[in-house]
Amino acid sequence: MSMPHIPASRGGVRIEHLVTSGTFSLDGGTWEVDNNVWLLATDTECLVIDVAHDAVAILDAVGDRRLVGVLCTHGHNDHINAVDAVRAATGAAAYLHPDDRMLWDVVTDRAPDADLAGGDRLTFGDVDLHVMHTPGHAPGACCFHAPALGVLFSGDTLFQGGPGATGRSFSDFPTIIASITSALFDLPDETVVLTGHGGATTIGAERPHLQDWLDRGH
């Protein structure tokens, strides 16, 4: 399947991307993982979605631009473990849904700077980000929809090939399916899904496979 087109920019706002590597730990297990770090950026400012593993690489990507905030799709360590170093270097605020505080608190003693809630609307330049609370992979999991760019930053809620994992603590398969069907599948087919791990997909590419996911149970 060909990769979906990622819009280059709108009103000077563009999407930038890097992959960082590290480990994910939960329930006594540890796994090596590669994570996507997404930036909404202009020439002078940027907003980071998920601060995974490598603060140096993330700060290099930010460069001399002002980091206006860090949005955390959820509280698993592999998505937030560079948060303190990035905050210390930039003074940027970190946003997290409060239902994931028990996961966050395993990683850092410093609280998030602000709460996310479903229905929130955040603005970066000419781009609005709609916060969608999509529990299932984690209780506080959130996706960020940028209608003007035609993209959804899905974290670990939706991937190419199905929903995020639900076999560990604080996760639930029926809940993630409800989040996807009641929120994400209402988006246009052409919406590009930029995921927390791996390649991009579209809503239209994933919607027809819902019954397959239900049949396999994950």
Label every PLM stretch briefly.
Residues 70-80, 132-141, 194-200:
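Histidine-centered catalytic micro-motifs
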Residues 28-30, 113, 133-135:
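Short Gly/Pro-enriched turn/cap motifs at secondary-structure boundaries
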Residues 46, 110, 128, 139-218:
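Metallo-beta-lactamase
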Residues 10-65, 143-154:
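Conserved beta-strand hairpin/beta-sheet module of binuclear metal-dependent hydrolase folds
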Residues 32-33, 46, 51-128, 208-216:
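Active-site HxH/HxHxD metal-binding segment of metal-dependent hydrolases
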Residues 86, 122, 129-134, 144, ...:
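Hydrophobic packing within well-folded, soluble alpha/beta domains
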